[in-house]
Amino acid sequence: MDAKLSAAQLMELENKHGAHNYHPVPVVLDKGEGVFVWDVEGKKYYDFLSAYSAVNQGHCHPRIIDTLVKQARKLTLTSRAFYNSQLGRYEEFVTRYFGYDKVLPMNTGAEAVETALKLCRKWAYEVKKLPKDTAEIVVCRNNFHGRTTTIVSFSIDPDAYNNYGPFTPGFVVIPYNDAEALAKVLDEHPHVAGFLVEPIQGEAGAYVPDEGYLKKCYDLCRAHNVLFIADEVQTGIARTGKLLACDYENVHPDILILGKALSGGACPVSAVLSCNEVMDVIRPGQHGSTFGGNPIAAAVAVTALEVVRDEQLADRAYRLGLIFREEMRKLCETSRVASFVRGKGLLNALIINNDETKDLAWEICLKLGENGLLAKPTHTNIIRFAPPLVITEEQLKECIEIIKKTIALFE
């Protein structure tokens, strides 16, 4: 396995021996540092996907990697059958960092969403006193919360749910960015336990709701004794120009779901945070994870969050996001190919006019790669641009020129 293989050979290995559940951009990456990645041939690229916002702190951030290596040499895993020297420190740190009583540590974003759903239902029966097996959770159209069986049960994406039934009941789907729809459901459904929402719909193409939407929904939840559950796996940890996207409307979710950049991309770490009233419904043996809260994850997460704070990444994302969207708006004013831009902070999307060819956004991304910038389409005609938050203004402006030059080739 030490023989040097070409990109074509490595891609063929994946195609032959791996499940075909992804359609990657045809580049084989071998190294990363900051905003850059290199392929196996040594070509250097700007990374404008950031592993779906998992590497907000930049690839292989030296402080994070130093913590990872030091802890890996000392103790990697204990399970939760025993205490470990890192978990309590992390739990104190992360709850104070985000302003909650308790945290339940998990590994992946989907695991954290599943955990939040379980917490919500259990709270509904044990605290709110809903009749057994009646609890409903309201979700939004075009949501993306993961790909587990329960989560795809309330997806409207056929790729996510086709031939995976029967599906888990107990979910009510309403339009996103429509507080009146939530109000109607809360008035008509007496057994609603929670409202699960993305503050910005990332996989839907950085779809930003109207100003005031989150606060209206939060207030409705308060009035009906319903838990407001925010999935900030992709939008959280400084990506949108605030520590949390909910912070734009001063909304403090009853249950907060985090993942991805919680480790800076160094290892899988996710978390569910809430108050004592909600979190204390979980008792020994009722939920768990062998790897959740492991010593490496705990140590790495503390350092990853310290980096976000110390390097003021939220402020940087806010400032540079304004520059990026303004330049993309100028591009769209004269382009036949690019329609409009939307986003917050450094989570942005360029909408491509796909009238002539369904594959135009994909072809643009391939050409962007040739020009030294990696991005990937979502939903056929949307290109998401989300670089690591450590990008400098000079680097961002260089990338803007790459995007403009590439789009011009398709005019």
Task: Describe every region a protein language model picked out.
Residues 1-411:
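Conserved N-terminal phosphate-binding loop of PLP-dependent enzymes in the Aspartate aminotransferase
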